[in-house]
Amino acid sequence: VHRRRAPNRSETPVLLPDQVNTILDGCSVQSPSGEWTGSEAGLRDRLFFAVLAETGMRIGEALSLRHNDFHITGGETPSILVAGRDDHPHGVRAKSGARRIYIGDDLVALYSEYVWQLIGWAADVAVADLASHFVFVNLARGQRYAPLRPETVYDKVDALTAAHADVLPQDWTPHWLRHTHATALLLSGVPEHVVMRRLGHADVQTTLSIYGWVTADAEMRTVAQWNSFVAGWKVSHDSTP
């Protein structure tokens, strides 16, 4: 992991692509037969961290997502609409205003697998209106299909860290995936104003004040194949919802 060099406190902690993949695979992997490994919550957890990595969302924004925020049909570029909600029962909220984030085919396929898993468990019967219900819900404990608590996410972070102590930093948090998203895009040559829009920043200066250092850091440019990491993402200049 690349950490800020003291005494400079302006650099953000970043996960390397291999570390992100360790997080995803540590949740669940798909077997050759198409089955997903791990617990019932494994696929949900993989989707959650994949959403953070590919979209740069904050944890509150991801936990606040509804199924009808995923726009993956109709022939248009697949996207997720991030709405400025504050109605999550566990107090998390989307800090930024509404924006549309375009996503790649792999994330679309992962989300679709998760939805089919929910339907296979009759979630569409148990929940009055699944389309408007929260995407990330309880599966392993608590009231089934109730909105997921942030504490559950952090419990998973702790479990992944313990299981992969040789790969993952001991102090990583879900927010590091947001930093990684921005870093990967900037080092892949994506314009700063596009990164700004995907992150939901009010102006490009905010983006530059947080992440401007990465483009001038020679080590960060060579420490990973950033272009390959973002190759499947759909990055668009149009962020209008």
Residue positions per predicted region:
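Flexible interdomain linker/hinge and immediately adjacent N-terminus
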Residues: V1-C27, L139-R144
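C-terminal catalytic core of Y-nucleophile DNA break-rejoin enzymes
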Residues: R9, H90-E113, H133-V157
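Basic, Lys/Arg- and aromatic-enriched nucleic-acid-binding interface segment
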Residues: D18, T22-I59
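Conserved tyrosine-mediated DNA breakage-rejoining catalytic core shared by Y-recombinases
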Residues: S28, S64-Y111, I119, A123-D124
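Short, basic (Lys/Arg/His-rich) helix/loop patches that form interaction surfaces
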Residues: S33-E35, Q143, Y154-R197, H201
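A short, glycine-centered helix-capping/turn motif at helix boundaries
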Residues: V51-S64, S188-V190, H201
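Catalytic-site neighborhood detector that most strongly recognizes the C-terminal catalytic loop/helix
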Residues: L199-Q225
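C-terminal secondary-structure termini that scaffold catalytic or DNA-interacting sites
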Residues: W226-P241
